């Protein structure tokens, strides 16, 4: 979810994602912080503003600036500073406080904090015509998603299906996942290619987010240059439930490799 829209200068944010549990707060508020830093020699003025967002079926962030949803964190958020200048590679700490958190609904609430440079930079691009110039307007914008879980929240991941099909001389896997409960599920994991009970190949799967009560589908190409024979693809994914416990989701699918693949 950490996104940069054509950054002109190298800007780093730590952490790039914030997840909070309101049930662990001793009061009616939560406080968190993140730091922003640019390269040495860069002087950039930034402004901050929050937006509500939803999670799409592809695990991406979809901004919804004018949302009145109950799970919108913006009405509860205060942040300091709301504008600052990065200079000489020195980091800037931004503090975010959420008040009246007992009014938040059960489950997950969210917002994204955008950091955007105040003044756009102009870049002249080379042109084949000396009488015509092309000007590019460049802005840097970073987004830090912030999630707050509160009350009775549940995180349940499900591995619904794993299929392998032949497409254009490639073997393609299609993976279907879903999440129950009222809070997102974030998973990571690996895939194994097995033949005759022996591990042939192993590779990392993309980490992704499934929205609460949402579905997610992913597809990819299996490793090539496999010998002919019968294989098993075993996918092992891990996520954390509402108690912070690691849970595994495992699915297997058989496939064959022939001379035509």
PLM region spans:
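Terminal connector regions
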Residues: 47-54, 99-147, 226-261
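Short edge beta-strand/loop segments characteristic of extracellular beta-sandwich folds
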Residues: 33-37, 97, 172-180, 221
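Ligand-binding face of N-terminal immunoglobulin V-set domains in extracellular IgSF glycoproteins
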Residues: 31-35, 78-116
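Beta-sheet-dominated interaction scaffolds and their linkers
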Residues: 9-42, 83, 157-170
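C-terminal segment of classical bacterial N-terminal signal peptides
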Residues: 1-7
């Amino acid at each position: 979810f950490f996104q940069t829209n054509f950054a002109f200068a190298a800007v780093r944010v730590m952490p790039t994602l914030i997840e909070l549990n309101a049930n662990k707060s001793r009061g009616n508020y939560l406080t968190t912080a993140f730091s922003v830093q640019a390269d040495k020699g860069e002087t950039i003025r930034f402004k901050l503003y929050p937006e509500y967002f939803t999670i799409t079926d592809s695990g991406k962030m979809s901004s919804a600036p004018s949302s009145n949803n109950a799970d919108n964190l913006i009405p509860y958020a205060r942040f300091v500073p709301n504008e600052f200048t990065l200079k000489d590679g020195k980091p800037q700490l931004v503090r975010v406080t959420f008040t009246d958190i007992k009014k938040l609904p059960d489950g997950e609430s969210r917002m994204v904090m955008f950091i955007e440079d105040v003044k756009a930079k102009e870049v002249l691009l080379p042109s084949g015509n000396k009488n015509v110039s092309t000007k590019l307007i460049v802005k840097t914008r970073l987004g830090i998603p912030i999630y707050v879980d509160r009350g009775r929240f549940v995180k349940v991941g499900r591995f619904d299906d794993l299929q392998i099909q032949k497409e254009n001389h490639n073997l393609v896997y299609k993976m279907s996942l879903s999440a129950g409960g009222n809070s997102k599920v974030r998973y990571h994991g690996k895939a194994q290619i097995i033949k005759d009970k022996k591990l042939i190949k192993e590779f990392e799967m993309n980490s992704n987010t499934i929205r609460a009560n949402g579905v997610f589908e992913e597809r990819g190409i299996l490793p090539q240059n496999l010998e002919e024979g019968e294989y098993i693809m075993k996918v092992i994914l891990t996520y954390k439930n509402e108690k912070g416990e690691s849970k595994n989701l495992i699915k297997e699918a058989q496939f064959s490799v022939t001379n035509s693949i």
